[in-house]
Structures are given as structure tokens and as C-alpha cells.
Amino acid sequence: SLNMARGKPAKDQLDLSMPMLDIISSTTECVDEAGTDLRNYGILDGIEEAKVLMASMLDDDPANVIVFGNSSLNIMYDTVMRCWVFGTLGATPWSQLEEVKFLCPVPGYDRHFGVTEAFGIKMIPVPMNEDGPDMDVVKELVANDASVKGIWCVPKYSNPGGVTYSDEVVRELASMPTAADDFRIFWDNAYTVHHLYDDVADQDQLLDIADACVEAGNPNRYFKFGSTSKVTLPGAGISAMAASPENIADIKARMGVQTIGHDKINQLRHVKFLKDADGIAEHMAKHAAII
């Protein structure tokens, strides 16, 4: 039967990653470069090699990266949850406020909206232009309303129009005055390596939100998210987030109560299979050839 669900790779695409399942067997020495036995507990923020790999996708420093399990949506939900329950960097927990609002560029990702809806957060639609969200609307809303705490962004090849945010839009998001000191950009760069063409001249380029925020004097404004869901296997990949050193320290302090660590064997499997940024690009070219 025909499956009309959007966002699911075809069988031929899934088959590309089947050799990854042969990389680790009962005879494999499951240790990282530091010599840590990955079969055991530990390494809250992910093995170093996986942090380096995911940092190449997230365009960030490995020191600012945390590697999780298979789902970036899970990370985003937990990130909203931490802001809701604990607040971020000493700010008032969102749950204690009379009202919390989020900006939602439309068309956008329904699962993003499902997260904010689950917390009772009021969602404000923002029109999308060919270069990203309408920044005149965004800037007015965030400047005048302290209850606007965040914005959902799929900044590259976003569905359904394939929009990539322009440099100007990225810089405006990073630098715009906000009434809320704890305003956060939820930067879901889900399609960062999903180019259709090999020639760099034919690929969209996205300005790094972290660099833009640092340059604008708002280094804690962004949370970046990504995963290998549409790179290797959607149900069995690895995911990661990147943020400022302050935010990462805050997140790890909360995470340390929630978990001892994620699936390090799968992190090792992905490192051995994809290797590095060049390996990811080579693998994604195979996806593009199928499409």
C-alpha cells in the first residue's frame, strides 16, 4: 500500500546505511579514543568522537555539543521542559509566568508546534518569506512583549518550500532587541547536509547562528539541534544539540539527574560509518542520487 506520510526515507535510502549494522559485532573492541569502555555507564554528553562528528553537522565547537539518543525532537521537548520547570540561566521558570508565547513561522513543522501546544504555550504565527520569517513582524513582537520567549526555526531547506534563511535574517534574529532576557531561538537545522547537488555553487549556504549571536552580544540566545535521522536510519540514528558554554553547563547540570548517558555503542557505530564531514557529504550524495 502507498504510505503518504511525509518525511520518511524510501527503502532504497534506508538500505544505504545497512552496512553500518555490520561495523560492530561481538568481537569489536567497544572503546573510544580515550580508552573508555563504551559498554558501561558514563559519558553524559557523548563520546568525544561523536561530538566531533555532530559538531561538523551543527557547525560548532565539539566542546559546545552534547550527543543524545536517536531523536532531536526528544531534545527539543526536553529543552522546552527545562525552561518550563527550571528556567534558563537563572531566569524565572516559564511555568510560573502568567503567559508564555512562541513565534511559529508558517508553514512550519507540525511536531514543533505540538511541543509548544503540549505546554499550553500560546503560538503566534509569523509569515515566511523567500529568505526566512518576516523579520518586521518578528522584531515588533519580541521587542514589545516579554511573554514571547522563543521562536521555532528550520533555517535550511525548510519544508515545504525549501527556504534557507538569508544572512540578513540570521543576523537580525541574533541582534534584535527582545523584551524577554531569556528569549531563545530553537534552531532545528534538520536539513543542514541535505544538498541535492554536489557542486557547492548549487548548494544553499547558511550563516551560523552561534557566530551571529556572539557577534551581536547575545551569546546565550540560541539552541541548535540536529540528527542523523535522514542521514542514516531515522529510528536508530544519533542526535545532538549545540549551545553556548553557559547554556551547555546549565543543561548538563539538569541532565545529570535525568540520565547517566545515552547509547554510546550507537554513537561509536555512527563515527565508524560516517567518519567525518567528508564522509557525511559522500553518504548524502548517495541519497541525492536516489532522489
Predicted ranges, named:
Residues 1-33:
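Conserved N-terminal helix/loop that builds the PLP phosphate-binding region
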Residues 3, 123-125, 222-224:
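Conserved beta-strand scaffold positions in the cores of enzyme catalytic domains, especially
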Residues 10-13, 157-160, 232:
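Short acidic, S/G/P-rich loop/turn micro-motifs used as interaction or catalytic elements
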Residues 14-18, 196-200, 235-238:
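Short aromatic-enriched loop/helix-cap "lid" or pocket-rim segments at secondary-structure transitions
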Residues 29-30, 35-181, 192-217:
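Conserved core of the PLP fold type I
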Residues 150, 184, 223:
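Hydrophobic "anchor" residues on beta-strands that sit immediately upstream
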Residues 189:
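Walker B catalytic acidic pair
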Residues 210-288:
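Conserved core segment of the aminotransferase class I/II
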